[in-house]
């Protein structure tokens, strides 16, 4: 489901742009600070409701403007197999308020936008997926579960709300009996979330490990899911057993909120073995594998956003990534300082856009 058209207004240094896009590769060429990353950021905002560079809305709205707009048209197929364009849009005010439009209807939810516009981001700091704590790897797993298990989003939201209530009760509870009622529902949700996550990782595992070996043939890659509490023990038993410790901490220590994807290379934690370039290549492999798996499972195509394509990658590794992306048949947006860095990827269906001072022109 590629974007056929993208309209951006008052976003960072982009005053206004309206561009027609390729369903294949779209190249954004320009020097640092030109606005090419802002185009990727705007697409990400359209699919996630937030920027990948700043959590502060005021920083992405153009100076002296009160709001920003990002609109797009998504190519869809109807039941009769006829193609049509679905208009989508997001408007953010400087006060942080957000309005989402889908098919011309206002008041839509961000989760609905994310569902119809699955995005994968690969950027220079992306290796943090492998080197930082488990939060990013949980988000990696949950991206896949969200797009393949319709009930996950509501279940995860309910689990987080109940966890917050439990943490508040921990401060005043005199005995575990005061929490047992809450913990029954919390445990039910935790077990369900764990089941979805484990099933997803088991399905993704073969695709991801195979693609990692294609990108990094010199290494043996292994992915393992950790659910966040002791294996083969019911979650409610864990909650009861750890009641006093949780009271001392002031929060619930174990649970789905501690889940992780543990990745090893040659039986050693990945961050202890790979160089920055190799880490980036592995992240690319994992992201592409997720997109491939999504297509195999649901028929949906995700959109890939790749910022600073040449960073940390030599020509051979760039070619491996390009070949894998072309093999997916997905829509891809690539930013690069020079056109020569992506020359081998250009074909008849691709489009090149030159970006300077926030102005985007097809070249």
From Swiss-Prot:
UniProt main location, coarse: cytoplasm
InterPro entries from the UniProt entry: DNA-binding_RecF (IPR001238), DNA-binding_RecF_CS (IPR018078), P-loop_NTPase (IPR027417), RecF/RecN/SMC_N (IPR003395), RecF_2 (IPR042174)
Entry binding sites for ATP: 30-37
MF terms (GO), sorted A to Z: ATP binding; single-stranded DNA binding
Cellular localisation: Cytoplasm
SUPFAM superfamilies: P-loop containing nucleoside triphosphate hydrolases
CC annotations in GO: cytoplasm
Record keywords: ATP-binding, Cytoplasm, DNA damage, DNA repair, DNA replication, DNA-binding, Nucleotide-binding, SOS response
GO biological process terms held by the UniProt record: DNA replication; DNA synthesis involved in DNA repair; double-strand break repair; SOS response
Pfam family, one: SMC_N
Family: Belongs to the RecF family.
Function in brief: The RecF protein is involved in DNA metabolism; it is required for DNA replication and normal SOS inducibility. RecF binds preferentially to single-stranded, linear DNA. It also seems to bind ATP.
Protein name in UniProt: DNA replication and repair protein RecF
Taxonomic source organism: Vibrio cholerae serotype O1 (strain ATCC 39315 / El Tor Inaba N16961)
Taxonomic placement: Bacteria, Pseudomonadati, Pseudomonadota, Gammaproteobacteria, Vibrionales
